[in-house]
């Protein structure tokens, strides 16, 4: 814009000079003195040609003086400079926004004032902060350890370097000097190599070529295999959190063999509890939620130590997960404390037609102290299909024994009770009558010879021994009549308001720890 205005101003000046030259030519022609040549150019105020003619018409003989004697021919004419049309005798003409005076032509830039640039409109970089423009502040992030340790200037690269990697420490700094000092202090104390600065465009968190991928160290958990469907991107709806598709016998045998042969190498998110016949999973923080769900469906979990966000149990049944959330929110003062889920479960039972019995669980929730995991040992796995029934009876006996131990505990709070699951926690107060009735109802529903989905004489015999130790009596009409038969799946899922007609009856006498009750 400034260049255009300057050119327009120069155009006006040239037009004024052109008008002045034309006026002088007209004046010379009127006086007949064209032979005297061009007159010297003076910086005079421009006038119109009509004004020149009108000025000449006002001349009188008295106003004209005699010309002195000339030494050269052709100089007898009147000197045009003595006429009355000199600039001082002319009326100024307004030709622009301002009147132009002769002195302006002697000034720099023809007298045109050059406006000073304002500071706000300046494009000089140091003045940007004064005009309100804020420069972006770059933070620096130090990833102290892990496979991608270094100093980053981008949070996206830092998150990719630390996300999903357990035990990685990182911190944000305002300047590169502070970040470098913190990184050097850490590497010096740990006696490790100096951390490199990794700009945003040079961060290589994944191999760029197939050759680099082959030379990269394999992931520690690459050998694990999950049996379920593809992991959903978000928590499934309550109706989707179930064991459908139902766990098959092949799935159970795979998990059973996996936990028996696990020796603790390659995965620090779990350890095992090994017995002579069976090994059970113990899941720690950052365990695979899909693996936890499948082991829960197989009845092969002893303990779960979840993170504060409970991500490890997010695929368990919704009511179980909600009960754990309520315990963390309502039952403990410090919600940041670690908790545990101690599970006693039966295992599935199959027939030729398919799944006959789904596991039943008794789960205790509590605050976890310092965890000292046991050493996992690789155990021999020689289980056959015909051995599954014997294993199911063994886990069923342990389940009944754990359930009956609740009668000896005087301070219990029932967190959730369902048809096949009971969740409880320790309480500082005595067990209320409502919780006591819930425990007794659950015992009556599950403690019977049909615990595993079919009538099992071995289970009945075990119940007789347990009840007789407590001074009670037990009767099973199927055992008395010699009708130990295998029931179908419908016998295990009878109506909730009453036991199925094939249930046996357990009668107990009054004892100091329990009231007289009927268990079917």
UniProtKB/Swiss-Prot annotation:
Q: Where is this gene product found?
A: Host cytoplasm
Q: Where is this region: Disordered?
A: 487-520
Pfam family example for this protein? Cauli_VI
Q: Name one GO biological process term.
A: regulation of translation
Principal localisation: host cell
Which SUPFAM superfamilies did the record assign?
A: L9 N-domain-like (SSF55658)
TM stretches of this protein: none
| Superkingdom of this protein's organism | Viruses
> Could you tell me the keywords of this UniProt record?
Host cytoplasm, Translation regulation
Q: Does the keyword Ligase apply?
A: no
Q: Which GO terms describe its cellular component?
A: host cell cytoplasm
Misc remark for this entry?
A: The inclusion bodies are the site of viral DNA synthesis, virion assembly and accumulation in the infected cell.
Q: What does this protein do?
A: Enhances the ribosomal termination-reinitiation event leading to the translation of major open reading frames on the polycistronic viral RNAs.
Q: Which family does it belong to?
A: Belongs to the caulimoviridae viroplasmin family.
Supply the name of the protein: Transactivator/viroplasmin protein
What's the source species for this entry?
Answer: Cauliflower mosaic virus (strain W260) (CaMV)
């Amino acid at each position: 814009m400034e260049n255009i205005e300057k050119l327009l101003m120069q155009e006006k000046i040239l037009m004024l000079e052109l008008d002045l030259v034309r006026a002088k030519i007209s004046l010379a022609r009127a006086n007949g003195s064209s032979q005297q040549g061009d007159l010297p150019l003076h910086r005079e105020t421009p006038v119109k040609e009509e004004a020149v003619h009108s000025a000449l018409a006002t001349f009188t003989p008295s106003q004209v003086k005699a010309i002195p004697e000339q030494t050269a021919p052709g100089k007898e004419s009147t000197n045009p400079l003595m006429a009355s049309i000199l600039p001082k005798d002319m009326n100024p003409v307004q030709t622009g926004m301002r009147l132009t005076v002769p002195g302006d032509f002697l000034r720099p830039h023809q007298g045109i004032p050059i406006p000073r640039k304002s500071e706000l409109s300046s494009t000089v970089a140091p003045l940007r902060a004064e005009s309100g423009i804020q420069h972006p502040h770059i933070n620096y992030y130090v990833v102290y350890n892990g496979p991608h340790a270094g100093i980053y200037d981008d949070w996206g690269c830092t998150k990719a370097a630390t996300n999903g990697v357990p035990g990685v420490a990182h911190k944000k700094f305002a300047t590169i000097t502070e970040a470098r000092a913190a990184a050097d202090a850490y590497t010096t104390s740990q006696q490790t190599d100096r951390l490199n600065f990794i700009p945003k465009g040079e961060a290589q968190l994944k191999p760029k070529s197939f050759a680099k991928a082959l030379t990269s160290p394999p992931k520690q958990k690459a050998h694990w295999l999950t049996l379920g469907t593809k992991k959903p991107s978000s928590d499934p709806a309550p109706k989707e959190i179930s064991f459908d598709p139902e766990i098959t016998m092949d799935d159970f045998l795979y998990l059973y063999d996996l936990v028996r042969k696990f020796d603790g190498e390659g995965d620090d998110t779990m350890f095992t509890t090994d017995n002579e016949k069976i090994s059970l999973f113990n899941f720690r923080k950052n365990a695979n939620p899909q693996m936890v769900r499948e082991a829960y469906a197989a009845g092969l979990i002893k303990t779960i130590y979840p993170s504060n966000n409970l991500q490890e149990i997010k695929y368990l049944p919704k009511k179980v997960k909600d009960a754990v959330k309520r315990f963390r929110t309502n039952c403990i003062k410090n919600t940041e404390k670690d908790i545990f889920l101690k599970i006693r479960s039966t295992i599935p039972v199959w027939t030729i037609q398919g799944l006959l019995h789904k596991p039943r669980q008794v789960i205790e929730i509590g605050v976890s102290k310092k965890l000292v995991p046991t050493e996992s040992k690789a155990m021999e796995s020689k289980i056959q299909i015909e051995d599954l029934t014997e294993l199911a009876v063994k886990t069923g006996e342990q389940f009944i024994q754990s359930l009956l131990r609740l009668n000896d505990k005087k301070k219990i709070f029932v967190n959730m009770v369902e048809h096949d699951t009971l969740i409880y926690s320790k309480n500082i107060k005595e067990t209320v009558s409502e919780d006591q009735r819930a425990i007794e109802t659950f015992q009556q529903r599950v403690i019977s010879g049909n615990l595993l989905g079919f009538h099992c004489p071995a289970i009945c015999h075990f119940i007789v021994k347990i009840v007789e130790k407590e001074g009670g009596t037990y009767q099973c009409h199927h055992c008395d009549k010699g009708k130990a038969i295998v029931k179908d799946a419908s016998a295990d899922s009878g109506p909730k308001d009453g036991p199925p007609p094939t249930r046996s009856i357990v009668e107990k006498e009054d004892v100091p720890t329990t009231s007289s009750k009927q268990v079917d």
